[in-house]
């Protein structure tokens, strides 16, 4: 607001004029040439600007949840995956009676376009669904050899929310169903760039290796000094069952011919142990029958007694005189000491009288 000046005799307020600045005052002060040391100090003390200057374009959101009946190890694995994936969301456990296609509605309500669903059966078998909701495709795996972060206690470590590198085995590019799984894993597990909850650093790597017709997952820390890898965890193995065209259902695109269900595996192991038990019982029965059989007597071999020498016969001596009894020295000493004590007692009693 401009400055005003009031007249002395009650007149109206008049706007005061600002004093004019000279041309010399208008000029900025002359800058002193900074030395190299001052420039270095300014650079050192300067606060760097924000690292993330880009725009968040990849809006991938992953829903990670499970069915009822999971054990503690599955729950810890689910928490580890949520920690490693800042673009994930959680939800309550789904009831076993609900059909799997209901998960597409849950994803739509949570505004998620990808889903990792853990399905527990018989409180000992764990299945994992990877799905692109709502149009598919989706893949079903049997999860084996689970080791969580708290269980492993590895020396590796990474920043929470940092973006990972994804390393795939060359075998993923050889077969079409592995190529489809590779693209699905890339879209689900890779953290979007410039995500609000992510950190602009790359300090760990997810490795996917194919061995024995299974996918082995490992998480390693990248050390800055020599680019060495130190395992962080968790670790698990995915045994592929089927790939479906739709999300949680639809036509089957691929079925693993090498897959053996856990029920069949337990049945085979039980049959092997039963066969071993039956074999042991048969051996015992044969041994009992052999013991009951009469022993076959071999004919006497006359040549067996060729080198047998008869022992010398000692003459039999008959003792006619009764042997003298042995003297018991201890009993004899006791009797002597007993006599001496009695003699002393008599002498002492005579003196007192």
From Swiss-Prot:
Glycyl lysine isopeptide (Lys-Gly) (interchain with G-Cter in SUMO2) cross-link, renumbered residues: 160, 314, 322
Extent of Basic residues compositional bias: 1-10
Cellular component GO terms, alphabetical: nucleolus
Biased composition range(s): Basic and acidic residues: 22-36
N6-acetyllysine sites (modified residues): 276
InterPro entries: Brix (IPR007109), BRX1 (IPR026532)
Keywords: Acetylation, Isopeptide bond, Nucleus, Phosphoprotein, Ribosome biogenesis, Ubl conjugation
Protein name (Swiss-Prot/TrEMBL): Ribosome biogenesis protein BRX1 homolog
Chain's gene name: BRIX1
């Amino acid at each position: 607001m401009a400055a005003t000046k009031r007249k002395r005799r009650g007149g109206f307020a008049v706007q005061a004029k600002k004093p004019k600045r000279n041309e010399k005052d208008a000029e900025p002060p002359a800058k002193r040439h900074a030395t190299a040391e001052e420039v270095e100090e300014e650079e050192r003390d300067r606060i760097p600007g924000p690292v993330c200057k880009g725009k968040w374009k990849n809006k991938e959101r992953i829903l990670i949840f499970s069915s009822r009946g999971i054990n503690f190890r599955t729950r810890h694995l689910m928490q580890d995956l949520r920690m490693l994936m800042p673009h994930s969301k959680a939800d309550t456990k789904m009831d076993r009676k609900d059909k799997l296609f209901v998960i597409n509605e849950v994803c739509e309500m949570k505004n998620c376009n990808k889903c990792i669903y853990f399905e527990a059966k018989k409180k000992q078998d764990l299945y994992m669904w990877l799905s692109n909701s709502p149009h598919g495709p989706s893949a079903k795996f049997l999860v084996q050899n689970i080791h969580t972060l708290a269980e492993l206690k590895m020396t590796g470590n990474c920043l929470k929310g940092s973006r990972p590198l994804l390393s795939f085995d060359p075998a993923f590019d050889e077969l079409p169903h592995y190529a489809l799984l590779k693209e699905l894993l890339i879209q689900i597990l890779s953290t979007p760039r410039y995500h609000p909850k992510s950190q602009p650093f790359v300090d760990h790597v997810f490795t996917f290796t194919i061995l024995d017709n299974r996918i082995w997952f490992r998480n390693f820390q990248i050390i800055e000094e020599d680019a060495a890898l130190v395992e962080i965890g968790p670790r698990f193995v995915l045994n592929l069952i089927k790939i479906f065209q739709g999300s949680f259902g639809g036509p089957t695109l691929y079925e693993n011919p090498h897959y053996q269900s856990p029920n069949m595996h337990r049945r085979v192991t039980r049959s092997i142990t039963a066969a071993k038990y039956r074999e042991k019982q048969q051996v015992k029965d044969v041994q009992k029958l052999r013991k009951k059989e009469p022993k076959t007597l071999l004919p006497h071999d006359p040549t067996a007694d060729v080198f047998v020498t008869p022992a010398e016969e000692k003459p039999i001596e008959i003792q006619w005189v009764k042997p003298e009894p042995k003297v018991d020295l201890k009993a004899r000493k006791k009797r002597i000491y007993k006599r001496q004590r009695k003699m002393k007692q008599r002498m002492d009693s005579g003196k007192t009288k």
